[in-house]
């Protein structure tokens, strides 16, 4: 039973965004420019607790992400927000590395399989792209040029 159903015919723009807008939002949060620095830090802390970040982190080397056994700080952490609806799978966020942070946004649509699972083609594709970007950032020690 839905107590507050969404009537999509009334909300045609619900959930409408672009990768550029989503990336700009994360960049402003990372810089503390979206709201106050304190509120931005709280937002980052919440986004770091996101459990549904498979598209961004699935192919990352586990030793970068999990330092629970040693008590050492994580070498890489991700503050992200994912979303999906029907044939769309999206994820975006801030990836912190020893060489600095970068923003990544992956948006996929028009997949025939609308079921949510980690080996969904959109998740596999996104994880590979995310890993390629991480590898480049680490190989260049954070010195990437867009020129």
Segments and roles (model prediction):
Residues 11-147:
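Structured C-terminal helix/loop/strand segments within mature extracytoplasmic catalytic/sensor domains
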